[in-house]
Amino acid sequence: MFGNLKKKLSSAIQEGLVISENLQQQYRQRVSSGNSGSSQASGITTPISPLGLNESLSSSRSSSLSLSAPFQLTDGVPSHLNVAAGCSLLAKYEDDWQQIHGANEKNAEKAAQIANQISGIQDQASHQHRIMSELNSSLAGIPTLIAQLQNSSQVLNSLEEMGKQLEIELEKLEDLREECELQEFILEQQFQLSRHKQKKLNELEQYRQQIAQKHQSKIKDQEQTLLKLQRERQAVFDDAFREDMEEYKQRGQLTKIQTTSNKLALEEVVLEANEVETKDALEQFLNG
């Protein structure tokens, strides 16, 4: 936008310069052709007014024209004609354009700032809009959420009941497990007891066999001892019998062997304490 305006102002300045040069050339041609300067000057001044010349500009430039009168006279231009009016106007337009350009740059900066602010506001509005949309969707889902919460509450209640039932079943299972462990312990103890009993029986059998072997060996030893004694007694008896037979053959009779038996009197018997008690009990029984 500002570039187009600058181009238009530049083209206007160039056109103004071209027009001023054409005017100077026309004045020079008319002066050289011998026409009256007053009539032509009046005819030339008339088209200047449409270019935006006014009395304030001609009065402001009168001092500069009076200083440049010799130059204009040499060129054939009247002294009361303001040839630099277009340049002053163009300079004024250029100054105005520079001011406008500066103001436009400031406006552009402010517009950029405002655009940034608008973008920020738009972003905030979009964010708020998105939040509102999410809030609306969330609010729209509240009934469904309430229904789900109710279902969840029912499920939790059912789970609580199932948990209680599960605790009861777990207690039963624990009791059953303890009972099974007790039975296993009893069976294990019975098995250990049976093993111990069998072990003791085996040991007892081994001990009995050992005792039996020892007893058999003792019996054999005793039998051998008795047999030896019997043989010795038999030998003694045989010797005594032969002696008796020899004596009988020689004398015709046998000598009597006197045996003395040790007899005890009743007064000589001494009873111990247990025997005294037994005697007292016997007397009470007989007297009773």
UniProtKB/Swiss-Prot annotation:
Keywords assigned: Coiled coil
Question: Does DNA-binding show up as a keyword for this record?
Answer: no
The parts of the chain that form a coiled coil are 147-239
Record-level GO cellular component terms:
BLOC-1 complex; neuromuscular junction of somatic muscle; synaptic vesicle
GO process annotations (BP):
adult locomotory behavior; eye pigment granule organization; long-term memory; mating behavior, sex discrimination; negative regulation of dopamine metabolic process; olfactory learning; positive regulation of synaptic transmission, glutamatergic; regulation of neuromuscular synaptic transmission
Job of this protein: Component of the biogenesis of lysosome-related organelles complex-1 (BLOC-1) involved in pigment granule biogenesis and membrane trafficking in synapses. In response to high synaptic activity at neuromuscular junctions, stabilizes Pldn protein levels and, together with Pldn, plays a role in promoting efficient synaptic vesicle recycling and re-formation through early endosomes.
- Which proteins does it associate with, and in what oligomeric form? Component of the biogenesis of lysosome-related organelles complex-1 (BLOC-1) composed of Blos1, Blos2, Blos3, Blos4, Dysb, Muted, Pldn and Snapin. Interacts with Pldn and Snapin.
Similarity annotation: Belongs to the dysbindin family.
The name under which this protein is listed is Dysbindin protein homolog
From which organism does this entry originate? Answer: Drosophila melanogaster
- Gene behind the chain: Dysb
